[in-house]
Design a protein with these regions (language model features):
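Extreme N-terminal basic, low-complexity initiation segments
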Residues: 1-12
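Hydrophobic, Leu/Ile/Phe/Ala-enriched alpha-helical segments that form helix-helix packing faces
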Residues: 84-87, 183, 187, 238
Length: 248
């Protein structure tokens, strides 16, 4: 399950006011608490869509209320588990984390939420469509629960406006490693530790943090899990740097 996001160095230095804080995201679409690493709703849904089950829907929904899906292919809102069943096993799926600095082609509708799930069906048709479908699921707040708004990504020519790229684990690991080095370099340049002495402890805790295994689907490949955790640590470093309005 790839996680696509813009270059983290730019996130650290250029877009503090336009990027939502961790507390703002939590208020807008709060679904769970995790042991250590923060798995956003879109990341959890992308992990569980290939193995649709009541357990997966429950993990995504958390304890704050049922989730529904607002899909133009259906009438009204559909319970998340029912939509997952109708959608069937996807051919490709990716959590995307667009930012104003790097919105990702075709995914502008996810900018406000800062996250979404890009899904491509496996076959030529499904219960929701008579043809191969590519769509974007964008999380939105709805009282104490959540709604996933489906945005079709198929253009008039029949081609997807945004396609899920093939997953290359080796390339992804190299990208995460390079981005981590950039993030640490940016933190050093910003010299945040001088004004925030607790930062070193926060970073130490984050570097050793792991994902709550109860939130992950069974059978998740160990190397993919490790890559996911490295990506989440990188994301967490960027969020720590952005917590202080004056830091960047």
């Amino acid at each position: 399950m790839p996680v696509q996001h813009g270059r983290e160095r730019r996130h650290l230095t250029s877009h503090r006011r336009s990027a939502p804080s961790r507390s703002q995201r939590s208020q807008r679409f709060r679904v769970r608490s995790v042991t250590d690493l923060d798995l956003r709703p879109s990341i959890l849904l992308a992990l569980w869509l290939p193995v649709p089950s009541s357990r997966g829907a429950a993990v995504v929904e958390g304890a704050d209320g049922a989730h529904t899906v607002l899909d133009p292919a259906l009438d009204g809102e559909t319970p998340l588990m029912e939509w997952m069943t109708l959608m069937g096993r996807p051919g490709r799926v990716a959590a995307v984390l667009p930012s104003p600095s790097d919105p990702l082609p075709g995914l502008g509708s996810a900018l406000d939420a800062g996250e979404a799930v890009l899904v491509q069906t496996a076959g030529e048709s499904s219960a929701l469509s008579a043809f191969r479908r590519t769509c974007l699921l964008v999380p939105e707040a709805s009282g104490t629960s959540g709604v996933w708004r489906v945005v079709d990504q198929t253009t008039q020519s029949g081609e997807p406006a945004a396609a899920v790229p093939p997953f290359d684990a080796a390339h992804a690991r190299a990208q995460v490693h390079a981005a981590m080095e950039e993030a640490i370099e940016a933190l050093t340049e910003l010299d945040l530790a001088r004004e925030r002495p607790e930062l070193a402890d926060d970073l130490t805790d984050l570097i050793t943090a792991v994902a709550d295994p109860r939130l992950l689907p069974p059978g998740l490949d160990q190397r993919r899990r490790e890559l996911l955790e490295r990506s989440l640590r990188l994301l967490g470093i960027c969020e720590i740097a952005l917590d202080d309005d004056g830091a960047a």
